[in-house]
A protein has these predicted regions:
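Mixed-charge interfacial surface used for oligomerization/domain docking
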Residues: 4, 10-24, 29-35, 94-97, ...
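Class I S-adenosyl-L-methionine
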Residues: 36-100, 106-110
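Short acidic, glycine/Ser/Thr-rich loop/turn "cap" segments at secondary-structure junctions
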Residues: 86-89, 117-121
Length: 289
C-alpha cells in the first residue's frame, strides 16, 4: 500500500531535500512583534535573513506548535487520496508538536479506518530529525512497508548524534538555562558551551571550551571519534546564519574522514529563537548518542 512521509519544519530540511524526498511539511509558526510567520511555506524559497537580523538585535521571538489546522491541511488530503501516512515528529522532549500531531491522528484513524497513520516521536531536532527522514525515505524507496520504515526509525533514532555549540550566551540566559551572572562572566571569558540532544530528546550542556575555534574543532573531531563507518555516511550540519563556518566544517569532515557527502542548512526560526545566531550543529550516526 502506498504511503506518504510527513515531517515538520523543525526538521530543517533544505528546499532541495524536501523536493527530492517528496515529503510534506507541517509548519510551526513564530511571532515577531505580534506578526505571525510560518517556518515553511510550500513553493516559497526559504529565507531567514530578516529573522536572524532581528535576533542579533535581541528581538523577542515567540513560537507555537504544529496546530490542528496545519495537520488538517497537510495530512487529511493524503488520506483522502487513499494513501497511508507516516509522520516523523519533532522531539517530545523539546516541543508539544508530537502530541498535537498524535491527537489529530487519533481522530483521523476514526474518520479513515481503512488508512494506516503512524506518528513517530523521533526524539530528534533540527537536521537530526531531518536525518531520520532521510533514512526513512531511503527505506521507502527500497520498497519497505510503512510498518518496516517506522520500526527502523524507532530502533535507530537514538543512534542519531546531535552535537551543538551556541555562540551567544544571551540566548541560554533568556531560556533559563544559564544565570545572568554566568552568562556575563562566560561572555567576558569567551566561553562557548557544548551541548547534545540526549536519549530523552532534551538538550543538555555537556561541556565548555574557550573560544569559537575550539568549539568548531570539537564538533569536527566528534564526527570522526563517534561516527560509525563515517566515510560511508552523509553528515548533516546546521548553522545560525554563519554559513562560512558550516562550509568549513563540511570541508574538514570530508578532508579528515573521507565523508562522501555533507548537507548544511539554516536553523529555522523556531529553534533559532532559543539557540540564537551563530549556533552550529553536526548530525551523524553513532553507536549511541
Amino acid at each position: 500500500m502506498s504511503y506518504k512521509i510527513v515531517t515538520d519544519s523543525s526538521a530543517n530540511l533544505t528546499d532541495e531535500q524536501i523536493e527530492s524526498y517528496n515529503v510534506d511539511i507541517l509548519s510551526l509558526k513564530y511571532y515577531i512583534d505580534g506578526k505571525e510567520y510560518d517556518s515553511y511555506v510550500k513553493g516559497v524559497p526559504t529565507d531567514y535573513s530578516e529573522t536572524y537580523s532581528l535576533l542579533r538585535q535581541k528581538a523577542k521571538i515567540t513560537t507555537s506548535l504544529v496546530s490542528r489546522e496545519i495537520c488538517d491541511a497537510v495530512i487529511k488530503p493524503i488520506l483522502e487520496k487513499g494513501e497511508d501516512v507516516l509522520v516523523l515528529a519533532f522531539s517530545s522532549g523539546l516541543s508539544g508538536t508530537y502530541q498535537n500531531i498524535e491527537n489529530a491522528a487519533k481522530d483521523y484513524r476514526e474518520e479513515f479506518p481503512e488508512r494506516k497513520i503512524i506518528v513517530v516521536d523521533t526524539l530528534c531536532a533540527s537536521l537530526g530529525e531531518g536525518m531520520a527522514v532521510h533514512y526513512a525515505v531511503k527505506l521507502k524507496n527500497e520498497g519497505k512497508t510503512i510498518e518496516e520504515t517506522a520500526k527502523w526509525v524507532e530502533e535507530n533514532k537514538l543512534k542519531i548524534c546531535h552535537l551543538f555549540t551556541i555562540d551567544d550566551l544571551f540566548f541560554l540566559k533568556r531560556g533559563g538555562r544559564l544565570s545572568g551572572s554566568s552568562a556575563m562572566i562566560g561572555t567576558l571569558l569567551g566561553i562557548k558551551p557544548l551541548l547534545h540532544t540526549a536519549d530523552d530528546g532534551k538538550l543538555y550542556v555537556t561541556g565548555k571550551v574557550r573560544g569559537r575555534r575550539a568549539a568548531v574543532e570539537h564538533l569536527i573531531k566528534s564526527v570522526g571519534e563517534r561516527g560509525t563507518d563515517i566515510q560511508n555516511q552523509e553528515v548533516f550540519i546546521v548553522h545560525g546564519d554563519c554559513e562560512e563556518e558550516a562550509k568549513y566544517i563540511a570541508s574538514e569532515i570530508k578532508k579528515r574522514y573521507k565523508v562522501k557527502k555533507t548537507v548544511y542548512n539554516y536553523i529555522d526560526p523556531v529553534i533559532a529563537a532559543h539557540a540564537g545566531p551563530g549556533t552550529l550543529s553536526v548530525f551523524f550516526i553513532g553507536d549511541k548518542r
